[in-house]
């Protein structure tokens, strides 16, 4: 079960990093 927790934390960190980048640099796809 430790692997599941590790994957969950890894996915959360990646999601947070992606969210921070999205906030810092607004997506230009809609324009």
Swiss-Prot record:
Gene Ontology BP, a term: photosynthesis
Entries under InterPro entries matching the protein: PSII_PsbT (IPR001743), PSII_PsbT_sf (IPR037268)
Primary location recorded for the protein, binned into one broad class: membrane
Pfam family, one: PsbT
Disulfide bonds: none
Record-annotated membrane-spanning stretches: 3-23
Keywords: Membrane, Photosynthesis, Photosystem II, Thylakoid, Transmembrane, Transmembrane helix
Compartments it resides in: Cellular thylakoid membrane
Transmembrane helix listed as a keyword: yes
GO cellular component term of the entry, any: photosystem II reaction center
Topology term for the membrane: Single-pass membrane protein
Subunit structure: PSII is composed of 1 copy each of membrane proteins PsbA, PsbB, PsbC, PsbD, PsbE, PsbF, PsbH, PsbI, PsbJ, PsbK, PsbL, PsbM, PsbT, PsbX, PsbY, PsbZ, Psb30/Ycf12, peripheral proteins PsbO, CyanoQ (PsbQ), PsbU, PsbV and a large number of cofactors. It forms dimeric complexes.
Cited function: Found at the monomer-monomer interface of the photosystem II (PS II) dimer, plays a role in assembly and dimerization of PSII. PSII is a light-driven water plastoquinone oxidoreductase, using light energy to abstract electrons from H(2)O, generating a proton gradient subsequently used for ATP formation.
Family stated for the protein in its record: Belongs to the PsbT family.
NCBIfam families in alphabetical order: PRK11875.1 (NF008825)
Name by which UniProt lists this protein: Photosystem II reaction center protein T
Organism expressing this protein natively: Synechococcus sp. (strain RCC307)
